[in-house]
Amino acid sequence: LVSKYCDHLPLYRQSGIYARSGVELDRSTLAGWVDQADQLLDPLVAALGRYTLAAAKIHADDTPVPVLQPGRGQTKTGRLWVCVRDDRPIGSSDPPAAWYQYTPDRKGEHPQRHLRQYRGILQADAYGGWGKLYGSGQITEAACWAHARRPWWDLYLSSGRDGTSIAAQALGRIAELYAIERDIRGQPPDVRQAQRQARAGPLLQEMHAWLSQLLGRVSAKSELAQAIGYSLTRWQALTRYCDDGRIEMDNNAAERALRGVALGRGNYLFMGSDAGGERAAAIYSLVQTAKLN
């Protein structure tokens, strides 16, 4: 399990490694062991999920995974979703945790089902499937400044890294906000909130006015307008962190939790079935939680 889900070694490679040492273990035998181990770990994974969703704030994200369609010789695109509980940035001693779920597609009904009992703050990207969760009034939306920054970075690169460009100015403003976060990392929520309101609040007001002014001067179909629009249409969710010290500026905690999935995806190419995706989600939950601790 560790070799496959932590070291990203597919079972056929593990079988080859054992064979070089004179131990004949067929890949199907190893797959059976993975399945049996997963069944034994189910109660622990369920408890981990309950613990993760007991947090006042969680980070969530998803990533595509190719899944073999039995009998068709083709793959489809499943999804691995992750919810991360990590309050170390606010000085909490509560252990961090990551809980993964697999689904055969990206329909919004899946995260809505996973989080139907959750009550608290959900920090995530702009995926539309989260919308009904926020509409219930039981989950508070917190958006991600890393996502808001990306279109500006792309524009900056396309300008040839022109330091005088509008994109460079936007990146500079966002960098000022992140500098404040570095100063207050590990502080309790009330201290973070006070510092943000005093230092980030005025910067955010200036940025909103600047973006609004720019939007009126550029073509509505331009990439610049899209970058501006991304931030302005999500402004309340993007700036909610300023008034709540528990919230982070971005959703990087969830994105980091999916890096291992991306590495594994590059090595074992696809999952053998939907059941294999569910097994992967369970074991990734334990592996990533162990890494966080």
Segments and roles (model prediction):
Residues 1-293:
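Catalytic center-proximal scaffold of phosphoryl-transfer enzymes
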